[in-house]
Amino acid sequence: MAYVTSTQLYNWRFTQDELANQRQECNAAVRRRLSAQYRAKAEVKGGDVPAEPTFLTAEEEFIIVKRYIFAMKELFHQFSDSGLPVDVFGFAATYLKRFYLNNSVMDYFPREMMLTALYLACKAADYPLGLQTFAAHIPRNREHYSEIVVHSELFLMEKLQYDIWIHTPYRPLSGLLVDLLAYRKTQLGEPMTIEAGEVATADMMTSLKKEGYEIIHKWFQTDLCLTHSPSQFALAVLLELGQKHPDLGVEKFVKNSVCEYNSSDELMEQKWTALNEKMEQIQTMIGEFEFLSDLTYGSDLEAVLMQCRNPLYDPLSEEYAAAKEQAEKLMSFLD
């Protein structure tokens, strides 16, 4: 299925304002519900009512989700022995982004949803791993998280409206790099170089793909997968590579080959202007974004989350144990 006819475009493409509004509305609704839940529990217990926990803001929730996308990238690299394709990370990161548009980290703990998203992504990207193989790459509490993943997979699919096929920017970037190297060789007659000197075309392709894919991995911390098409995402990454390696002549390639720019064609001039504006928007977003480079950032928010998370979904809480016991009694009655 092409992107232009996909659910990704029709169901999961937003403006920055729409994303901000959805997150604010979701956060406000959860805060109201958890606050009411807390007061009701305090009234039942009676006596002195302890202070209500501090709840996370929408902005703080975004930081936590960003933190777990970074953690997911680190975990993804642990699967090198399984040969997971890069699309798996793109699928999983997009799932997590979509899920937390309409759901809160205060309800559904991000570590659990991150693992579930990664496991589901393996299947959706046509590279299924057995649960034992998957769990073997989880650093700790493997049995606990295996159970969580099994019980959360269908729930995640439902929350994603079963839109689990993702068009990622990896393949478009690959195609652009192939065209770039062909353009340099046939049109410009330039040697294949990257600063250090002449490099074989295949080696250069491998090097640029690796570098470009790492940029894509990093940029999944932003909302690019929700605000722009995969091809625009990929083109922005190519331009980023061009800034890192000026000798590649990326801008000339984009203008002359990708866009086939002709200044005498008014329609072409308009398209070129529109594309430049799109790329400038992305570059501004990337330039202003605060990327995570290690997991120490946001650890204070994680501590707040542990205090304010919904006890009904916390396996260690009394409320969760009571709800589980009630569900088991109901199931035994049905048997």
Curated annotation (Swiss-Prot):
Location(s) in or outside the cell: Nucleus
GO biological process, one term: regulation of transcription by RNA polymerase II
Principal location class: nucleus
InterPro entries, sorted: Cyclin-like_sf, Cyclin/Ssn8, Cyclin_C_2, Cyclin_N
Molecular function in Gene Ontology: cyclin-dependent protein serine/threonine kinase regulator activity
Domain of life: Eukaryota
Keywords: Cell cycle, Cyclin, Nucleus
Coiled-coil residues: none
The UniProt record lists the keyword Nucleus: yes
Pfam families in the cross-refs: Cyclin_C_2, Cyclin_N
Keyword Zinc included in the entry's annotation: no
CDD domains: CYCLIN_CCNH_rpt1 (cd20524), CYCLIN_CCNH_rpt2 (cd20525)
GO CC annotations on file: nucleus
Family: Belongs to the cyclin family. Cyclin C subfamily.
Role summary: Regulates CDK7, the catalytic subunit of the CDK-activating kinase (CAK) enzymatic complex.
Protein name: Probable cyclin-H
Gene name for this UniProt entry: CYCH
